[in-house]
Amino acid sequence: METRGIEQMFDFQRLPNDRFILLLLLLYAPVGFCLMLLRIFIGVHVFLVSCALPDSIVRRFIVRIMCSVLGLHVQQNSPRLRDKTTRLYVCNHVTHFDHNIINLLTSCNTPLLEGPVGFLCWARGFMELGQGVGSRTELTETLHRYCSSPDTLPLLLFPEEDTTNGRTGLLKFSSWPFSVSDSIQPVALLVKRPFIAVSTPESSWLTELLWTFFVPFTVYHVRWLPPLSKEDGETHQEFASKVQGLLATELGVISTQITKADKAEHIKRKRHSAPQTAHSNLGARPRTVAQGFLGTSVGAEDSRIARLAQQVKEVLPDVPVSVITRDLLQTNCVDTTITNLLERTDQFNSEAAMTMPSGPGKAAASSTPSAMVSSPNLKPAAKSFGRSPIDRHMSLQERKEALYEYARRRYIEKHGLNKEDDL
């Protein structure tokens, strides 16, 4: 998974970074709050009207006009390309309301794959599948039987299974939506709005709705692509990749292999690294950072990392706990972390030397027993300065090997390990 690529596919920050746009947003904020309250009142009436009127072209026209008052403007290109005989539409996913927007243009049903069922599912415009659908195979079979019925509305599915910002790339299309029907019609969706991002990860649909009412408008561009059918001998995944490439070309973005699971893992990693970065900036006292890190540990994984960090801290007391923890999150091994930190021992020693008080009396008082014990075993400096770069490099390598051997011996003695077992 490419971190750089996945960072560009999602807007993790709602507000803009541009100071001028942020200033305009602050000036607009009082108007936006008043507009949001007014649109909440109007939105209730839009919901009641959509529930009272039967599904028809008249209802879609009236609701579409009322949604324009709510700030949802829908535009479509080449409406004649929409095939009325198509049983399955596939579309890229940008916001929580993509299915509602497509439903303003043509009647279709979108099954609810995740979330609460019941009234809330119906009110949001989803189709409830029932309690019997558990696995992906059962879901595919249920939707396949639904598409085979002649009196049902077309299905609208999102093969990405999660939202993106729609500006950089598409998530990898899942193959199961393309096993529902061999004939599909791709729909390209592009969403734009001023001031703020159209969607952010981990944001609920209710929060997104309030932000939609807050901004002046949100424009949805819908583009209908010609229908496609799966060729003989073509697998469902190959068919999904072909449709993904066509939609990416239409939107001017790239097709990626990043999945919904990769997005969830990246969000989890960012959530985990955020408090760690905050604790690393609190101060220069390692013990305070360690207590702060242990205080925020709520899972077994954090407790294990903290325990490993304490073991490394006992071997290398001069290294800050924040540095040890950051390296352990990457290596997940005490020995590897000790080796990596020993490579940077000169950096820590130079920082300690800069903070050491001047004067012979203070210097003697600030010396630690560990430094006194390690001084005969370690080789902090070469006996003579090498005349050639090779000699100087060998001198540095010898000091590193001595430091590593001392740290290894101290670790074995601390935990009562045998050298044969450790090797």
Curated annotation (Swiss-Prot):
Recorded family membership: Belongs to the AUP1 family.
GO biological process terms held by the UniProt record: ERAD pathway; lipid droplet formation; lipid droplet organization; protein localization to lipid droplet
Cited function: Plays a role in the translocation of terminally misfolded proteins from the endoplasmic reticulum lumen to the cytoplasm and their degradation by the proteasome. Plays a role in lipid droplet formation. Induces lipid droplet clustering.
Intramembrane segment spans (from-to): 20-40
Keywords: Endoplasmic reticulum, Lipid droplet, Membrane
Subcellular location: Endoplasmic reticulum membrane; Lipid droplet
Descriptive protein name: Lipid droplet-regulating VLDL assembly factor AUP1
InterPro entries: AUP1_CUE, CUE
Disordered, as annotated region: 355-392
Signal sequence residues: none
All residue ranges annotated as the CUE domain in the record: 304-346
Gene Ontology CC annotations of this record: endoplasmic reticulum membrane; lipid droplet
Membrane topology per record: Peripheral membrane protein
Composition skew (Polar residues), residue ranges: 365-377
One example GO MF annotation: ubiquitin binding
Originating organism: Danio rerio (Zebrafish)
The organism's taxonomic lineage, starting at the top: Eukaryota, Metazoa, Chordata, Craniata, Vertebrata
Cytoplasmic side, ranges: 1-19, 41-423
